[in-house]
């Protein structure tokens, strides 16, 4: 059989990432609102019809109706209880990461020579937020250092950008709980990816612009100059009021310790609170409690009338590292269990008319000519809910499972997540207004920079519908990740750990070394993206050889060889989908080019 491939060889039948993405592109490129699918295919982006298979209410007897009502009440209580424990597990998870990484985070922030490099500042913001699992904690460190004159506002801007990127890791971790079902995982992971893609695209535009013009710094200065500011009351703490009774029985941390470590004023080497109050004069005691050594004393100050804290680790002799590992394992176990329960209960509750009503309310659009208004109302709703919860991580972690079960579409989740970015900066603004008078202006300027950064991102990637690039990119990423589930783990490791660490290491060597290595790599990636887009949209503009990637080794343009390698290393087959979902394909090139060629 003749072949157009080099060497007259037909490759082994595979389904690679290019085939999957190309199919998605063809579906999105049609003028109809319904995707064009091959025969026998189902569109995973279409919200599934959650049909009610139970017996109609009118046909039930009195006992059956009582059982139905009791079951509904129990499901509602189970859903609320699972959601409560899910939120508490996120709080404990954040405490665990702070115990494991806060000392490192504080030491990293001390190095002003490294922070003067914008790329290094960005990477440090990503790494620290990933370590402590809390954008509020990372922002508080930056605000404290700016107020203490250890950092300038200009140096803090790239760090704030990195904090914004690092906060999207939580929703990605949550989406992994739905990896058991291919379509649910595709929708859930695309929802988590759209948040990270938006943040990275905004950074790619604004970081060079800020380095050249100091745009965000000047905007924040103008806003401060035009406003009449007075200290306000402390920001509301709605969510903490609900979670504190449980989480404070597990562990309590010294919230000022991380900032003290970063500013060099640390007096106690342990983050765990052992004394929560005093009724007498304190007496000084020696402390040798370390992160990796035994604790001989709990605090550097021992009250005359001791009022010990009441939590599981109040009297522990374990190190911060050991306590952090215990909390990490326990919180992850509870988190995964609650997510499984939430997804199962949502699948059980959201049936028939209930599902239709919920979908209609969340995904509704206004009639023409006001159809564009629905997305902006979703932005406001996301900002308001995040402000009420005071946690963007909790809000995004709640949206992702709803996307997986088919309640929220990707097009509606996108503005909700953008609103969440705005909502978390509003909380920071109120917290800055509650700062002491001598620190209020510095804290407020950093909070305003965070706000303007997210607002600029919305103007860039949402205001003009044609520029809403994170949505198709997240769809394509979801297609590939659903086919090769191990890609999700690679994305987490590369996007939030390995690549930031590599960039940080190069920045330590110097700006010239970073530019010498990073410049060609970034240029190569941009060139590959440009050629790939032209292959699919305008292949006639390219030389014949560049109209496909078939001339490259298969492992450079297909994930199939890597999938076989991962499958051999993962005998439980968790990293790969069932064989029933695998289809055959005989080429990797652009189908428009090969349409007239004989294989």
From Swiss-Prot:
It comes from Homo sapiens. Its main location: membrane. Involved in actively transporting phosphate into cells via Na(+) cotransport in the renal brush border membrane. The cotransport has a Na(+):Pi stoichiometry of 2:1 and is electroneutral. Glycans are attached at residues 265, 268, 286, 299. The chain crosses the membrane at residues 77-97, 112-132, 189-209, 323-343, 368-388, 446-466, 486-506, 511-531. Optimum pH is 7.5. Residues 98-111, 210-322, 389-445, 507-510 are extracellular. It is a multi-pass membrane protein. Keywords: Cell membrane, Disease variant, Disulfide bond, Glycoprotein, Ion transport, Membrane, Phosphoprotein, Sodium, Sodium transport, Symport, Transmembrane, Transmembrane helix, Transport. The lineage of its organism: Eukaryota, Metazoa, Chordata, Craniata, Vertebrata. NCBIfam families: 2a58, Na_Pi_symport. This is Sodium-dependent phosphate transport protein 2C.
């Amino acid at each position: 059989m003749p072949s157009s491939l080099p060497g007259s060889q037909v490759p082994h039948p595979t389904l690679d990432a290019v085939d999957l993405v190309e199919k998605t592109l063809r579906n999105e490129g049609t003028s109809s609102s319904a995707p064009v699918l091959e025969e026998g295919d189902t569109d995973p982006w279409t919200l599934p019809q959650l049909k009610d298979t139970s017996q109609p209410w009118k046909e039930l007897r009195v006992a059956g109706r009582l059982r139905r009502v009791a079951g509904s009440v129990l499901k509602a209580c189970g859903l609320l209880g699972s959601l409560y424990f899910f939120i508490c597990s996120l709080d404990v998870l954040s405490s665990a990461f702070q115990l494991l990484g806060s000392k490192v985070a504080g030491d990293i922030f001390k190095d002003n020579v490294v922070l003067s490099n914008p790329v290094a500042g960005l990477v440090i913001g990503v790494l620290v937020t990933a370590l402590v699992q809390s954008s509020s904690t990372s922002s508080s460190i930056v605000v404290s250092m700016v107020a203490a004159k250890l950092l300038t506002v200009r140096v803090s801007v790239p760090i704030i950008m990195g904090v914004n990127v690092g906060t999207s890791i939580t929703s990605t971790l949550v989406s992994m709980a739905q990896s058991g079902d291919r379509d649910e995982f595709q929708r859930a992971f695309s929802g988590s990816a759209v948040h990270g893609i938006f943040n990275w695209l905004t950074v790619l535009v604004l970081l060079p612009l800020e380095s050249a013009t100091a745009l965000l710094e000047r905007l924040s200065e103008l806003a401060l100059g035009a406003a009449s500011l007075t200290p306000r009351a402390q920001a509301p703490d709605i969510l903490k009021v609900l979670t504190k009774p449980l989480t404070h029985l597990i562990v309590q941390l010294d919230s000022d310790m991380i900032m003290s470590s970063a500013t060099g004023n640390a007096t106690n080497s342990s983050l765990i609170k052992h004394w929560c109050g005093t009724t007498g004069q304190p007496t000084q005691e020696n402390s040798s409690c370390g992160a990796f050594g035994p604790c001989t004393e709990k605090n550097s100050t021992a009250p005359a009338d001791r009022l010990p804290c009441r939590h599981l680790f109040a009297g522990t002799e374990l190190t911060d590292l050991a306590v952090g590992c215990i909390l990490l394992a326990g919180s992850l176990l509870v988190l995964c269990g609650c997510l499984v329960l939430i997804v199962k209960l949502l699948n059980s509750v959201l049936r028939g008319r209930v599902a239709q009503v919920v979908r209609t309310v969340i995904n509704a659009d206004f009639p023409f000519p006001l159809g564009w208004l629905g997305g902006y109302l979703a932005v406001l709703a996301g900002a308001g809910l995040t402000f009420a919860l005071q946690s963007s991580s909790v809000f995004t972690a709640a949206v992702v499972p709803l996307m997986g079960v088919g309640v929220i579409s990707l097009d509606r989740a996108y503005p909700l997540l953008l609103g969440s970015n705005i909502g978390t900066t509003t909380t920071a603004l109120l917290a800055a207004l509650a700062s002491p008078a001598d620190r209020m202006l510095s804290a407020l300027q950093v909070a305003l920079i965070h706000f303007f950064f997210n607002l600029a991102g919305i103007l860039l990637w949402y205001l003009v519908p044609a520029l809403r690039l994170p949505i198709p990119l997240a769809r394509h990423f979801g297609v590939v990740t659903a086919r090769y589930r191990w890609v999700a783990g690679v994305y987490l490791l590369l996007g939030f750990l390995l690549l930031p660490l590599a960039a940080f290491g190069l920045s330590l060597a110097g700006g010239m070394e970073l530019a010498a290595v990073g410049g060609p790599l970034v240029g190569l990636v941009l060139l590959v993206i440009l050629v790939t887009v032209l292959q699919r949209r305008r292949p006639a503009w390219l030389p014949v050889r560049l109209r496909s990637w078939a001339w490259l080794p298969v492992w450079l343009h297909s994930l199939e060889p890597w999938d076989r390698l991962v499958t051999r290393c993962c005998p439980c087959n968790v990293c790969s989908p069932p064989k029933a979902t695998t289809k055959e394909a005989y080429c990797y090139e652009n189908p428009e080019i090969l349409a007239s060629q004989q294989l």
